[in-house]
Amino acid sequence: MNSQIKNKAVYWGTGRRKTSVARVRLIPGNGLIKINGRAGDDYLNFNPLHLNSIKAPLQTLGLENSYDMYVNVFGGGLTGQADAIKQGAARALCELSPDNRKPLKTEGHLSRDPRAKERRKYGLKKARKAPQFSKR
């Protein structure tokens, strides 16, 4: 894994999910997570699902205590933001070393989830909800 690691101090990755966009910066450190200037667990309301989602790419490679993660994220809700951060972290780890790509890809951390809110259509109340039908 360490065969092609570059001697660069900062690794960037961008992740997206629904309407959330996250710019993730990985710096060699001891596992600190800062999201929009706040502690990661505080920003995500101490939700273990979101916290594990964010740490998943680093845990896949066994680097959870080797890099600090500084994140700038906007748009969407907490779940969308957490998944955007996960993808951004995975892309930053691919920039760190090309050997990291295969394990991250098999775990699904690099794939963009295409599901988004469906647009509302005219004649309907919501995207698919139709007004009540009356025969007479």
Swiss-Prot record:
The keyword Zinc-finger does not apply. The keyword Cytoplasm does not apply. SUPFAM superfamilies: Ribosomal protein S5 domain 2-like. Signal peptide: none annotated. One of its GO terms (cellular component) is cytosolic small ribosomal subunit. One of its GO terms (biological process) is translation. Disulfide bonds: none annotated. InterPro entries: Ribosomal_Su5_D2-typ_SF (IPR020568), Ribosomal_uS9 (IPR000754), Ribosomal_uS9_bac/plastid (IPR023035), Ribosomal_uS9_CS (IPR020574), Ribsml_uS5_D2-typ_fold_subgr (IPR014721). Residues 117-136 have a biased composition (Basic residues). Residues 97-136 are annotated as: Disordered. Keywords: Ribonucleoprotein, Ribosomal protein. One of its GO terms (molecular function) is RNA binding. Residues 98-116 have a biased composition (Basic and acidic residues). Belongs to the universal ribosomal protein uS9 family. PANTHER family: RIBOSOMAL PROTEIN S9, SMALL RIBOSOMAL SUBUNIT PROTEIN US9M. NCBIfam families: PRK00132.1. This is Small ribosomal subunit protein uS9. It comes from Prochlorococcus marinus (strain MIT 9301). The lineage of its organism: Bacteria, Bacillati, Cyanobacteriota, Cyanophyceae, Synechococcales.
